[in-house]
Amino acid sequence: MTELFADDSRSNRERMLAGDPYVADAALAQLSQQALSRTYEYERAYLEDPASARRILENLIGELGTGVDIRPPLRVDYGSNISIGEGTFINFNLTALDVAPIKIGADCQIGPNVQLLTPTHPLDPEERRSKIESAQPITLGDNVWLGGGVVILPGVSIGHNSVIGAGAVVTRDIPAGVVAAGNPARVIKQLA
């Protein structure tokens, strides 16, 4: 493992943020643990103290637009690599593994049990055993609607005003102004 990074003076976090192979070391584990703790604080505050809940989100999420509503529970790897545009609504149980940036546009609607998954692992079993991973960003344009249970895989972009049907697994980019559904998701309708 150390041989792979022998000529690279960057930290694992720096390699991770650059989209290069890295190992989730103790420093990254600590950041992830802090994010997990904040998500639990957010859950407790959501009903009892909305102003406090908003402050917790502002400290957890990298960029948070006005009027964003996220129903708990919320699960993130770090939170700091997520940006959410104004007026976006996120229903219960979002999992956003933000090893790479996750950009959610303005006025999006995200159904329950959605997964935004940026990490990827080597296909080669020996490389995978060494715990090396990398990630690719996910981008959702403005006014995107993700139905319940949608899974978005690493490197995917979804264009403005598109709808992804419930239960879809999105493995490649989806253009603007369409409805896509299925596993793997494919465009089934052009919107006017």
Question: How should these model regions be labeled?
Answer:
Residues M1-G67, A185-K189:
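Terminal amphipathic alpha-helical/low-complexity segments used for targeting or macromolecular assembly
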Residues S157, T171-R172:
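Active-site/ligand-binding-proximal alpha/beta "capping" segment
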Residues W145, V163, V179-A181:
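Short-chain dehydrogenase/reductase
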Residues L47, L74-I84, F89-S157, N183-A192:
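Flexible, glycine/small-residue-enriched loop-and-beta-strand segment within the central core
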Residues G159-S162, P175-G177:
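Conserved catalytic segment of ABC-fold P-loop ATPases
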